[in-house]
Amino acid sequence: MSSPHGGLDDQIERLMQCKPLPEPEVRALCEKAKEILMEESNVQPVKSPVTICGDIHGQFHDLAELFRIGGKCPDTNYLFMGDYVDRGYYSVETVTLLVALKVRYPQRITILRGNHESRQITQVYGFYDECLRKYGNANVWKTFTDLFDYFPLTALVESEIFCLHGGLSPSIETLDNIRNFDRVQEVPHEGPMCDLLWSDPDDRCGWGISPRGAGYTFGQDISEQFNHTNNLRLIARAHQLVMEGFNWAHEQKVVTIFSAPNYCYRCGNMASILEVDDCREHTFIQFEPAPRRGEPDVTRRTPDYFL
């Protein structure tokens, strides 16, 4: 007897071979994903054990390596903190695979929104152009960017590890503040939703102006107050290239996790993932780039901001 998930399992198998799905299949998949994501909270609760991952940026073969090292989904539960697309050569295959896994195993994988899951940013940094190249039109780009509006903004592991792409906001004191806003929209240029996806921890105290032009920098005093107010042990975030794949800040109140090794195929960094076990103990696993088969011939006309 054929399994009710046969078609989806077949799609996942094709995607694991780095083969894009036809446009009608992408559309149907994103419709199913939207129904699942609509039900998720702005602060999505997640149970341990779970493996927390940072930016992927279209580096498909390195995502396959991440699953090889961390365990296949659904054998391992995963929480991804955004930035699936742009910069790497395989944004289409990367984001389609993660969305397909979400539809197939909704309780086993959580996919948060990053600052690159936006219409505006993807038109500059590669995903839009890649969709045009692979499909001959912008329909798949539109389908995915419409879906991105439904991705949860943050997650909370066992009520004590707060996970999000960027960082904190001067407009947000409590997790309830986040639970109460309407996330189904393009990432705004400013305000609390923007800050969650764009802010960075900093060595200086207090709030600072971000060199990125969006979000803020926040000091250890801010992290400590936020963690204290919300009974948190740790803030886990992504958004910044760190050479070892992970980096502690604010006396271990904040950790940055970056999961794209040799970022942009030239930065020479390690990648890492963070395993949180049943006892809420955590272990970082570092990994290097997967062996590369020749890269596609793509002209790079994107500006280099390395943040």
Curated annotation (Swiss-Prot):
Transmembrane segments: none
Keyword Mitochondrion among record annotations: no
Requisite cofactors: Mn(2+)
Active site: 116 (proton donor)
Keywords in alphabetical order: Cytoplasm, Hydrolase, Manganese, Metal-binding, Protein phosphatase
Alphabetized InterPro entries for the sequence: Calcineurin-like_PHP_ApaH, Metallo-depent_PP-like, PPA2-like, Ser/Thr-sp_prot-phosphatase
Keyword Manganese tagged: yes
Reactions accelerated catalytically: O-phospho-L-seryl-[protein] + H2O = L-seryl-[protein] + phosphate; O-phospho-L-threonyl-[protein] + H2O = L-threonyl-[protein] + phosphate
EC number, as in UniProt: 3.1.3.16
Pfam families documented for this protein: Metallophos (PF00149)
UniProt enzyme class: hydrolase
Cleavable signal peptide: none
Binding site for Mn(2+) 1: 55, 57, 83
GO biological process: mitotic cell cycle
Residues reported in the UniProt entry to bind Mn(2+) 2: 83, 115, 165, 239
Annotated protein name in UniProt: Serine/threonine-protein phosphatase PP2A-2 catalytic subunit
Organism: Oryza sativa subsp. japonica
Gene (name only): PP2A2
